[in-house]
Amino acid sequence: MAKGVKHISSNNGKWVYYDVVTGKMAHGEAHLNYDKEHTGWYYFDQNTGKMAHDFVYLRQHDKWVYYDKITGKMQYGEHYINDGWYYMKPVTGALAKGRTWLDAGKKWVYYDKTSSRMIHGGAILDGHHYFFDPHTGAQYNKQQIIDRLTSQARALLNQHPDCPGVLAANGGLICPFGPCMAFVWYIFHSAGLDIFLCDGAKTGWPHHNYDWYRSRGRVSHTPHVGDIAFWKFGDAWAHDYDASYAGVVVEVNGRNVIIIDAAYGDIGIRSAYNGANYAHPYYDE
């Protein structure tokens, strides 16, 4: 009589388990503990008895778990599976969902509420704006997000990227009267922070972006580093608009506000022009 974990080669092959006392084939969940190699939780198909080697939903416990592709044993902790990171809770093996603290890495991360895969980059989740490190998944705080944005802006000084061209290639609207807003968009985009500019809207028209923030009560005369500075100059084309120019605030020293913008045929750093209104992205909300 066969007992223990056995491989059956017929019908494309499968691993099964026969009870070490009765010899009866196991179905459903089973905790094995008959030798050092086979100790832990396993799952066997309810009909065929085939050992699971993948994600399985355990209806009776209302949880998703993962069984190793080689051993079939239920897994716990962090695992890299099918090009993504997952976390299985230490006691139950249930896949983590939502915002989760990883003590081993001393970091907050976020697992998608549907797939349970770790999220990287910018994301709007439950109405809140987040940025997760592209490599580690660690959640950035407000200052880290602003530092990432302003560092990217400084890295573009005296460069000549085709900001309108990249914006157009990404499906954005182009303003034919200048690249200032396309440059602001390009800073956010190249830093991976697209969602922090009008929730990911793609338009090179300054007034589109200004109106978006103003309608949400996010515009004031008080500047902060990481803000978007807007002006309405006397351009004839902008007569009916509330903004015709934009730049990014990178320093605030008392009343001296420093911006980086695309002006005079170059990307430069300079003191803010008079009469600015400052839009405040949702860095911490």
Regions found by a protein language model. Give the residues of each.
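A short, hydrophobic/aromatic-rich structural module that often spans a beta strand
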Residues: 66, 209-214, 277-284
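Extracellular adhesion/carbohydrate-binding repeat motifs centered on closely spaced tryptophans
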Residues: 1-144
